[in-house]
A protein has these predicted regions:
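Predominantly a core beta-strand signature of beta-propeller blades
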Residues: 11, 60-61, 137
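Positively charged n-region of N-terminal signal peptides that target proteins for export
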Residues: 1-4
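Sec/Tat signal peptide C-region and signal peptidase I cleavage site
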Residues: 17-21
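Bacterial N-terminal signal peptides
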Residues: 6-15
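N-terminal secretory signal peptides
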Residues: 22-64
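Active-site-proximal loop/helix of nucleotide/amide-processing enzymes and allied scaffolds
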Residues: 22-24, 74-86, 90-175
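Residue-level structural signal for beta-strand termini and adjacent loop
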Residues: 66-67, 133
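Catalytic phosphate/metal-binding cores of nucleic-acid and nucleotide-processing enzymes, i.e., regions
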Residues: 67-70, 77
Length: 175
């Protein structure tokens, strides 16, 4: 009975969709486990890997639509067997000429347009949460909390904050 109740609670939370301002601990742990597996491939091939996070009919977290992208983009296919709650992707291998430690404007725009939230893992081992409704970014955990690219150099090309509004992100990429 307790398992069924827990599954129902997870399913109802997932159906709430992008209006969720935050995440729950079970989702965060599942995302870290999933993205840590993809980080290794991302660093090896210097490509983004992406997909969708959702909840199955049985109330379990699952992924779908996994895709290999390019150096700076990735386009997963939305699975029909999940109630999708968020997108997720890696930011490829470390490159001193890219702002890969912060989600891009394209990342935020894609989540907002798709009606989802998003999760982004960076070469420095950061994990970001994108609220697709408010277009705000929150640093869930800092450098090294996830698998990091051995070539990562801190603060290149510049220092990274712990939260950004969409306007702040626009200024960051403009400056």
């Amino acid at each position: 009975m307790a398992n069924r109740l827990a599954a129902l609670v997870l399913l109802l939370a997932a159906l709430a969709g992008p209006a969720r301002a935050e995440w729950n601990d079970a989702e965060r742990k599942f995302v870290i486990q999933t993205l840590n597996q993809l980080q290794k491939l991302s660093f090896k091939h210097h490509r983004e890997y992406c997909g969708f996070l959702g909840v199955t009919a049985h109330g379990k977290f699952a992924t779908g639509g996994l895709s290999q992208g390019t150096l700076d983009s990735c386009f997963p296919t939305k699975p029909d067997y999940l109630t999708v709650t968020a997108s997720f992707h890696t930011h490829g291998g470390f490159d001193s000429t890219h702002w890969s430690e912060v989600p891009s404007l394209q990342d935020v725009d894609s989540d907002a347009a798709g009606g989802t939230n998003g999760w982004v893992a960076t070469p420095g081992g950061r994990l970001w949460f994108i609220n697709g409704t408010t277009r705000t970014l929150t640093l869930v955990c800092g450098p090294g909390c996830m698998i990091s690219d051995p070539n990562y150099v801190p603060n290149v090309p510049g220092p990274v904050g712990s939260a950004y509004t969409y306007d702040e992100l626009q200024r960051l990429f403009r400056d």
